[in-house]
Amino acid sequence: MAKKIVGYIKLQIPAGKANPSPPVGPALGQRQLNIMEFCKAFNAATQKMEPGLPVPVVITAYADKSFTFILKTTPASVLIKKLAGLSKGSAQPHVDKVGKLTRSQAEEIAKIKMADLTAADMDAAVRTIAGSARSMGVEVDGV
């Protein structure tokens, strides 16, 4: 018989840097899950990723105090800022443009994000990424 799910916990944790301090400790502690076990498993799973990049994770908590987790891809906004060389997006995105992306850079981000996007094909994924970039005040050439 399947385990009874008691809840889901959604967090964004830097790759390879999960530790028991907030936000991880309190979120897992509320569900009485083993915090250190999660931290070790998460750090092992994100070992090959670039250290420090935020990784969204969905933790499924079960009634027997066990858990499973699913790693998502890094948020598009973080990847856009990284490729455009920005520290933050524009305060007025449709007025002040703060950077530029080429179509090939947008395709690179779309390839990374494809698993988490609902886009039917690569062109739709690129347009989705271009829309995210525009909403941050980053121009996208060729889209």
UniProtKB/Swiss-Prot annotation:
One GO term of the biological process aspect: translation
InterPro entries: Ribosomal_uL11, Ribosomal_uL11_bac-typ, Ribosomal_uL11_C, Ribosomal_uL11_C_sf, Ribosomal_uL11_CS, Ribosomal_uL11_N, Ribosomal_uL11_N_sf
Gene3D superfamilies the record matches: Ribosomal protein L11, C-terminal domain (1.10.10.250), Ribosomal protein L11/L12, N-terminal domain (3.30.1550.10)
Pfam families: Ribosomal_L11, Ribosomal_L11_N
Superkingdom classification of source: Bacteria
Keyword terms of this UniProt record: Methylation, Ribonucleoprotein, Ribosomal protein, RNA-binding, rRNA-binding
Single annotated GO MF: large ribosomal subunit rRNA binding
Cytoplasm recorded as keyword: no
Family assignment from sequence similarity: Belongs to the universal ribosomal protein uL11 family.
Record-linked PANTHER family: 60S RIBOSOMAL PROTEIN L12, LARGE RIBOSOMAL SUBUNIT PROTEIN UL11M
Name under which the protein is recorded: Large ribosomal subunit protein uL11
Annotated organism of origin: Nitrosomonas europaea (strain ATCC 19718 / CIP 103999 / KCTC 2705 / NBRC 14298)
